[in-house]
Amino acid sequence: MLFTVRALTSWTGGHVLRLFGVPTPRPVACLIEKSGPLQKQAYLLMEKVSGEHLYWMDHAKVIDAGLGVPAQFASRWHELCLLRATHGDMKASNLILDDEGVLQLIDLDSILFHRSGRGYERQRGKDMARFMRNWKESPKVQEVFRGALIAYDEARG
């Protein structure tokens, strides 16, 4: 195979994240059809997660202290940091508040586990910029998420 298949990236990323306790749907199956050395098709089956995408949630609900979405986002962000991982497409539609109230990461086809600190820091900055663009029309929401990240850092010294 000349390149990494996105389905295989999602499959591997999902297993690694779950191994380290990061909430994400469980990868169930991955099938890659090949013709000689070239890949023809790839299929990925993930566990179904019922819930609400952050993108579709009312902004007031997103920052509702009772749901704890900003604090959970800060936890997901720091869990990725500990793994030196970047999502690659950190938009609100790739975060689901499941029916149990747990914030899950989805759409892992661009996840990277970095070896180089420089590449990691650059991509991490892109992930945060992409996430904050979700709320460009609502500075209050951005402020709440930034505050949650700062509070998380301060709580862990």
Regions found by a protein language model. Name each.
Residues 94-106:
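Conserved protein kinase catalytic/activation segment
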Residues 85-92:
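Catalytic-loop of the protein kinase fold
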Residues 65-76:
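Conserved alphaE helix
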Residues 29-32, 92, 97:
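Hydrophobic/anchoring residues in structured secondary elements
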Residues 103-157:
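C-lobe/activation-segment region of protein kinase-like
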